[in-house]
Amino acid sequence: MTIRSMTVTESRDDKDSSCLNGPYKLKTKLIISVLIVLFIAGGLTGYFLGLTDKGKPSEPPDPVLRLRPSASLLHTFKKAAVCTDNPACSEIGRNILQQNGSAVDATIAAMFCNGLLNQQSMGIGGGFFMTVYIREEGKAYSVIARETAPAGATVDMYSGQPDKARFGPLAHGVPGEVRGMWAAYQRWGRLPWASLIQPTLDFCETGFNVSQVMYDMITVAPYAKDDPILRRQLFDTKTNKFHPPGTTVKPSAEWCRTLKIIAEKGGDDLYNGTLAVELIDDLKKAGSIITADDLKNYKAKVTDPIAVKLANGDTLYTPPPPSSGAVLVNILNILSSYNFTADSIKGLDNEVLTYHRIIEAFKYAYAVRTKLGDTDFLDLREYIANITSPQFGIEVRQKINDNVTSNDPVYYGAEGYSKDDHGTAHISVMADNGDAVSLTSSINYYFGAGYVTEKTGIILNDVMDDFSSPGFTNQFGLQPSPANFIAPGKRPQSSMCPSIIVDKDGNVRLVIGAAGGTKITTAVALVAIRKLWFGETVKEAIDHPRFHHQLIPMTIYYEFGLTQDILDGLRSKGHNTTRYRDRGSIVCALYKNKTAIYANSDFRKGGDVAGMD
């Protein structure tokens, strides 16, 4: 499998290393970062969630001129870097590296932190995909800890009651987060297990600050805002309102106790120890069908990733299905032979044409996605080899009409439709020994299934909503994808695609991934294209307003910032357009060359990067 070189265009990352000669002190950088995060988060909330005097959403027109760069920082480091959705979690991961922890150690420590400080998106009640690269071996691995359907699940269990797949006790898959972390730690961990959890346990004493994102989500998430444990943590009884951003709150005592037991007894205790007994009691009381055997029998998979050779000798590593790594590769394969460069987006006509081609590639790739599912239940080896091959990409590219689009999903090869997925958080890590980790984790919808378990204090996922169910024909007359139907022990298809690019000498070049549900795959593709083909810095690539097309519904979703003339150009080719008002996708990317590591955390969520010089 070969894709045209994605690194032929020199970027401004490569040209500007002046900040290496006079680095800021870490404390100063953290203070500045926090101030910037608060400023941006407040501005975004006021923009995206702003209300008119009458209480109706305000919708400013699409801009005529391009937006100014965000206030996020383009960081440079000499040795190592950790990028997360929260500055404190990045610092925790960096501190683990400074203690001679491995890249996996740093990732696990940041995951536990993110599971608290971004508890609306991920946590120990969810699951993940992880790509690990070990420099000494010159080899990459995929860790698949996606949640599984309980043994008592049936293909039609949500017939006539689809909301039960999204909220409440029947929405849970068997959580894989902790067993997946434990499996990765057993193989690549270096520091004591408890030391990876202690920095997060410290928040049980000191408390943590409510982020803008957490505040936004708790105020709108159905059911979750009424949960007694979440309200005890996040609700101010004096004002009768949720605590505003910046307020210091403490985690629940139940959650702190659970985390302490995991630290003391190891990751398996949640699956076959005292915590497992308590969790099953919680779930039975709530009405879940997850059993003690479901927990005991859950296994995280350590397997080979999809490995795609680039024409210059670089290699892209990304997880196999049920992740969307194959979809990402398919997008890049389709676009590879266009030989995009910085000139491809110079001038209005070129920019419109290039975006049109990218959007068409998205549509073809999301048709491919409708046939993907859990490879433990489907033999997809031949299909994956085909859709990730250069020849398949060329054949699809030849079908793209530069002048007009189609609004028929069947035209692009869709034989069914896929469910949307939601939520997620991403972590990217580069260690000073050359190892790297790209990790995307999720509890699916904001605050998962909308409640916290009584004894164990865990926010459980609602991953069952990511499965397709028979009998729901969409507006195009397409049936849901059978590849993603529910079966006991099966993992649902996901948009997550944590990826690592390594050069021909075995050195990590790019660690990238995203949060944002169904928009994840296109966001990763867009940022990679902008960085590696258009020659932008990682900050420029992440800052740029993004667009997304998932074939169904038949519209380009775009965020504020795409200019009116570009949108008019796309509409003239027959595209429908819809502007979304939420944060969309959130990207964390680390890029390394011979000079430095260049890193940026997406301004849309207020994360940051910490590193070592």
What is each PLM-predicted segment?
Residues 1-26:
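Short, low-complexity, Lys/Arg-enriched N-terminal segments of secretory-pathway carbohydrate enzymes
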Residues 25-27, 42, 46-95, 99-265, ...:
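Noncatalytic scaffold domains of N-terminal-nucleophile
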Residues 31-44:
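Single-pass alpha-helical transmembrane segments
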Residues 59-63, 241, 245, 252, ...:
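Internal maturation/activation junctions in enzymes
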Residues 116-120, 126-133, 137-141, 290-291, ...:
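Active-site rim segments in enzyme catalytic domains, especially the processed small/beta chain
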Residues 122, 126-134, 425-430, 498-500, ...:
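Short beta-strand scaffold segments in enzyme catalytic cores
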Residues 302, 421-424, 446, 494-496:
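Short, small/polar residue-rich loop motifs at catalytic or cofactor-binding pockets
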Residues 470, 490-491, 524-525, 533-582:
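Extended C-terminal subregions enriched in glycine
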